[in-house]
C-alpha cells in the first residue's frame, strides 16, 4: 500500500545573524584653494554614510562626511571645510553570505582633525558598524496524506512571520526659502529622512515621507544662525508585491546629499538633492494546519517526525525618550547649535518579561561666549526606557536636536528612540516520512477491546494503539468530546 504525503512550503525571512565591527581610517588632506588658511580647529564632526552592501562578500563600503569648523587669521568669522573619508569593512561572519539584505546601524567612536600646517589637515575616524543580516527561510510542513485507512492528527497554529524584505534607493530634490537673512555660507548641515506612510497599489508601493534638515550658516555680517526645515518627499517603488494582509514598515537612511545656497533677488533659498535608502519589511499573521502524527488501520506504519523551527517576529517596538541639556549665559540671548551627537549603544536588562534599556547620549554644542567668540562644550546625559518582552535585538535612533533660547538660556532636547525586535522560536512537530512495516507473523486482532485508560493517556494514543479511530471510540462510548471516562472504555478495532 502506497501512502503519499502532501507538503506545504511557506517562504519567509528571518534575522539570520548579527555582526559588529570597528574600523579605523586616517588620511591627510589639503585645504581647497578657496578656503582660508586655518589657524585653529574649533570642532570636527562626522556623519557615517553607507553606500554599498555586499552580503555575498561580507563587505560594507561608505564614507565618513567630516565637517571641520576652524578659525583663520586671514578673515573674520567661523570657517568650515567638508572632507569625505572613504572606508570599507569586511565581516568574517559566514552567515552573511546567506543573507538577501543587510541593515546597518552605525556610529562614530572617534572623529578628530589636527593641523599639520595651516593648509594641511590630519583626519582620523573610527566607525562602528552593527549589521543585521536578513535571509530567506523555507518552512516545509506536512499538510495532507493519501492512503487506505489513514488516520490523521492535525494541529492549527497562528504564526507571526516576516514575509518580505526589500531594499531600494531613490533620489529627491527640493528647494525652500530661508528668508532675507544675508546667508553667506553653509558651515554645517545634516539631513534625516523618515517615512510617514506607505500604501500598496497593485505591484507598486507608494511611499511618502519627510526630510528634516538642520544647517548652521554664517551671515554676511559674520554672525551665526541655525536653520531648521522639513521638506516632503515621495517615491513609487515598482515591482514590489507585498503578501496579502501584511503590515508594512519602511526604514530609511541617507546615502548622500548636497545642500547649497541659491541666491536671488527675492531673498535666499536652499536647494537639497539627496539619495535615500529605503528598506521595506512586511509582517503578517498566518494560520498553518499541519499533520503531527498519522497511522493506518490497514497496516503497521513507521512514522518519522521532524521539528521545524519557526522564528515568529512582529514589528519592532519603539519607545521615544528625550536627552535634555540646559546652557546658561549672562547675556540677554544665547546662540547655540549642536554640531554632533551620539546615542552610544543600548544596555539591556531583562526581568519578569520586561526589558529595561539605557543609553548615554553625548553631544557637542557650539555657542558664543560673552565676547561673541565661538566655543564648544561637550555634555552627556543618560536616558532610560522600558519595553515589554525581552528583545533579542536592540538598536537606537535619533531625530534632529531641538533648541529653545530664552532670557540667556538655551534648552537642548534630542529625541532618542529605543527599538526592540523580539524573535520567539516555536517548534512545530510535523510528519516528514512514513514507511510500511511488514509483520513476519501477524497475529489476529480482536474486533473490540475493553480496557481502562492509563494515566495521562489521550484518545489519539488509544485509537492508534488498537487500530481504531477517535470518532469510532467516541460513538461507541457516547462521548461528546475527547474527555476520557474514569471507568472502562470500549475500543472498536477497525479492520480492512
Task: For every predicted segment, state its role.
Residues 438-475, 480-496:
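Primarily a LysM-type cell-wall glycan-binding module
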Residues 2-445:
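Membrane-lipid interaction segments
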